[in-house]
């Protein structure tokens, strides 16, 4: 994720940031977009995708500008994440709170990415050999007799459920772990390019399957029965802003902003296509199960391509969490921070890949953590830092007004979603949202100086 130095800058510097962000956008939510299309309808899904794509693009551009400004001011913590600029507004405690929220969001994204990879690998193993192999550790329970083994390794039929309560390190877990470590060591344009190519192939085959399964005599609903129910899945698919600040350093703010815009546009088109195809089809199983059930070699290959494509984003999420932990939360060297983030992500993934916790991670991180760290925080920082330009220039008045309006809107939406998930009645949700929207933003708290035009 290291940006190029200014002396190596070229007109194509935006391609590498675009590849990285496309691979982070290519996440677990992609496999449920067909269901989102059925919930929101064809037009509703397209409008949701377009709205979140525009919001993510704007937030990413503002995050690039804030990162450049923080680097120019040489603030403590730097501009490599969104927590560093918070230090100038709310002090060290505020920076640590922001770092904890951002690190948790990144780890949640990593867990969801790992879980999807494991599920795809396990599904491939079951389709090819008809069984699942691995190491199982049974957890203590009242049902566990003294003769039952606490630890065993072997294979079981694909239809046989995992004996509960237990944790399983399946072949899918071990394969995902090995390939993710390899991808992190070989991080670079080639790794990201392979992930992008595999995503294109897998998405094409998934779209072809949806087209085959579309009910010919069924009228496509322009507006589905529950459009808002599709919002969490669509929101989760645009969780890329946290990966933007490291790409905007050392004079690469404009290239990173262009790359973010290209990534959001490309993935918005892919998301909209899948959602529209899903809106016209019958309810399907999750993508891996649906594709493997056909028995076609091309569909088996599609699952493999989707599996490989998901691996490219795991190092990006873990590297971002590592940096936040090391810079703001724990006084540890890079190796210890790396181990802490990796252990947390992989431990949760092993525990969650056979449970409903996976769905909970997607829903809660969409509504709470990602709603705050991916949209609200970058826009609030943009307002507080005086709307810096990508190249040190003054921001247009219209852009400043838009940033302030979106900052208030996202803060109000975040507060309303917290209250809604807590079970508050609608009038409490409305009151909290109104109060949040009307609360003053921390504008002008960052002193501007002539040094803003310099880049470290």
Regions found by a protein language model. Give the residues of each.
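TM-loop-TM module centered on a large, flexible mid-protein loop between adjacent transmembrane helices
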Residues: 75-92, 265-312, 331
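Hydrophobic alpha-helical segments and their helix-loop junctions in multi-pass secondary transporters
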Residues: 114, 119-126, 180-183, 194-220, ...
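Helix-loop-helix junctions that connect adjacent transmembrane segments
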Residues: 4-10, 133-258, 266-269, 278-294
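Transmembrane helix-loop boundary segments of multi-pass membrane transporters
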Residues: 35-40, 125-126, 157-162, 185-195, ...
């Amino acid at each position: 994720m290291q940006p190029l130095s200014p002396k190596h800058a070229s007109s194509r510097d935006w391609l590498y940031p675009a590849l990285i962000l496309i691979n982070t956008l290519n996440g677990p939510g992609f496999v449920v977009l067909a269901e989102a299309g059925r919930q929101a309808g064809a037009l509703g899904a397209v409008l949701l995708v377009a709205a979140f794509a525009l919001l993510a693009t704007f937030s990413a551009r503002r995050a690039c500008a804030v990162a450049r400004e923080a680097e120019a001011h040489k603030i403590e913590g730097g501009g490599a994440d969104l927590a560093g600029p918070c230090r100038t507004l709310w002090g060290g405690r505020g920076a640590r709170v922001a770092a904890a929220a951002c690190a948790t969001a990144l780890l949640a994204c990593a867990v969801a990415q790992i879980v999807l990879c494991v599920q795809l690998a396990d599904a491939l193993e079951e389709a090819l050999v008809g069984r699942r192999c691995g190491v199982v550790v049974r957890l203590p329970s009242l049902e566990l007799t003294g003769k039952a083994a606490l630890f065993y390794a072997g294979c079981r039929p694909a239809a046989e459920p995992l004996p509960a309560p237990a944790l399983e390190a399946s072949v899918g877990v071990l394969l995902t772990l090995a390939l993710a470590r390899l991808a992190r060591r070989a991080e670079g344009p080639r790794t990201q390019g392979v992930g992008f190519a595999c995503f294109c192939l897998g998405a094409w085959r998934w779209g072809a399957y949806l087209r085959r399964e579309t009910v010919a005599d069924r009228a496509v609903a322009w507006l589905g029965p529950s459009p808002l129910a599709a919002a969490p899945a669509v929101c989760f698919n645009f969780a890329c802003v946290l990966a933007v600040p490291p790409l905007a350093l050392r004079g690469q703010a404009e290239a990173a902003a262009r790359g973010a815009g290209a990534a959001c546009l490309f993935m918005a088109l892919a998301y909209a296509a899948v959602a529209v195809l899903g809106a016209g089809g019958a309810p399907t199983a999750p993508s891996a199960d649906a594709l493997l059930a056909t028995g076609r070699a091309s569909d088996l290959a599609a699952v493999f391509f989707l599996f490989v494509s998901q691996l490219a984003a795991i190092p990006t999420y873990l590297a971002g969490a590592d940096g936040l932990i090391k810079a703001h939360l724990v006084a540890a060297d890079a190796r210890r921070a790396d181990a802490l983030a990796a252990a947390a992500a992989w431990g949760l993934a092993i525990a969650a890949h056979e449970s409903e916790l996976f769905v909970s991670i997607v829903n809660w991180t969409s509504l709470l953590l990602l709603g705050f760290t991916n949209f609200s925080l970058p826009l609030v920082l943009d307002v507080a830092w005086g709307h810096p330009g990508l190249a040190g220039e003054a921001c247009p008045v219209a852009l400043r007004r838009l940033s302030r309006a979106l900052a208030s809107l996202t803060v109000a939406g975040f507060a309303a979603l917290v209250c809604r998930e807590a079970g508050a009645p609608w009038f409490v949700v409305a009151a909290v949202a109104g109060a949040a929207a009307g609360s003053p933003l921390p504008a002008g708290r960052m002193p501007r100086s002539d040094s803003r035009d310099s880049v470290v």
